[in-house]
């Protein structure tokens, strides 16, 4: 069974995540004090039910030791996982402006911007311990719920999930990436007028890139690097490894290479997911 601890800055989507987890069969509790986590887990162990609990600045423990003690007191049948949601500063400000809700730290006579910044500092101990960090800045409510369903229901218990994610540098680097590889130096299909409207998922673009030795060398050396360190990453008690591949616009080279790497590790029996940030943004 899983004890999913959901944390993140206010406005990043914790309520949406809890609703999605509840739809997946989790017993969900909003803002449960950390010291009560073992009691909740023991009561649900008898019912063989996974749980999801949100933690934010309102119920943060006074010290990291309190959090660690609570986790070590869980029944052996429970596997704790920490999901941290985040969004960039401007997105959080816009969301608060749209909903006109008060920030949890507004009672300290802070401006909204200062409250968001202070919350970021207070939550850093949880963020640094997270098994999975999701940046919701460019996600709709539906997209966040769908991502959680895909990642959680598509994951075999206690197995590392490799996520290969393409992106465009002009749109920013994904903050949830464990590794970032820059492929802007590779031949660019964008300069071929016939290939420009296509993506790295289309065969003509794939054929163009496949003709270049440097593309093959990059894929080979990148997968060799990942294969070298993957055994240690798998034994490091982590749930996800997110590998981000970036080109200029996130449309051709990064998409193709992310798919090639995903296919390779999938063929080796690894649990693999792929995501293309720019293409998904264009479809939304």
From Swiss-Prot:
<dbReference type="Pfam" id="PF03668">
    <property type="entry name" value="RapZ-like_N"/>
</dbReference>
<feature type="binding site">
    <location>
        <begin position="56"/>
        <end position="59"/>
    </location>
    <ligand>
        <name>GTP</name>
    </ligand>
</feature>
<comment type="similarity">
    <text>Belongs to the RapZ-like family. RapZ subfamily.</text>
</comment>
<dbReference type="GO" id="GO:0005524">
    <property type="term" value="F:ATP binding"/>
</dbReference>
<comment type="function">
    <text>Modulates the synthesis of GlmS, by affecting the processing and stability of the regulatory small RNA GlmZ. When glucosamine-6-phosphate (GlcN6P) concentrations are high in the cell, RapZ binds GlmZ and targets it to cleavage by RNase E. Consequently, GlmZ is inactivated and unable to activate GlmS synthesis. Under low GlcN6P concentrations, RapZ is sequestered and inactivated by an other regulatory small RNA, GlmY, preventing GlmZ degradation and leading to synthesis of GlmS.</text>
</comment>
<keyword id="KW-0547">Nucleotide-binding</keyword>
<dbReference type="InterPro" id="IPR053930">
    <property type="entry name" value="RapZ-like_N"/>
</dbReference>
<dbReference type="Pfam" id="PF22740">
    <property type="entry name" value="PapZ_C"/>
</dbReference>
<protein>
    <recommendedName>
        <fullName>RNase adapter protein RapZ</fullName>
    </recommendedName>
</protein>
<dbReference type="InterPro" id="IPR027417">
    <property type="entry name" value="P-loop_NTPase"/>
</dbReference>
<keyword id="KW-0694">RNA-binding</keyword>
<comment type="subunit">
    <text>Homotrimer.</text>
</comment>
<feature type="binding site">
    <location>
        <begin position="8"/>
        <end position="15"/>
    </location>
    <ligand>
        <name>ATP</name>
    </ligand>
</feature>
<keyword id="KW-0342">GTP-binding</keyword>
<dbReference type="GO" id="GO:0005525">
    <property type="term" value="F:GTP binding"/>
</dbReference>
<dbReference type="InterPro" id="IPR005337">
    <property type="entry name" value="RapZ-like"/>
</dbReference>
<dbReference type="InterPro" id="IPR053931">
    <property type="entry name" value="RapZ_C"/>
</dbReference>
<keyword id="KW-0067">ATP-binding</keyword>
<feature type="region of interest" description="RNA-binding">
    <location>
        <begin position="266"/>
        <end position="284"/>
    </location>
</feature>
<dbReference type="GO" id="GO:0003723">
    <property type="term" value="F:RNA binding"/>
</dbReference>
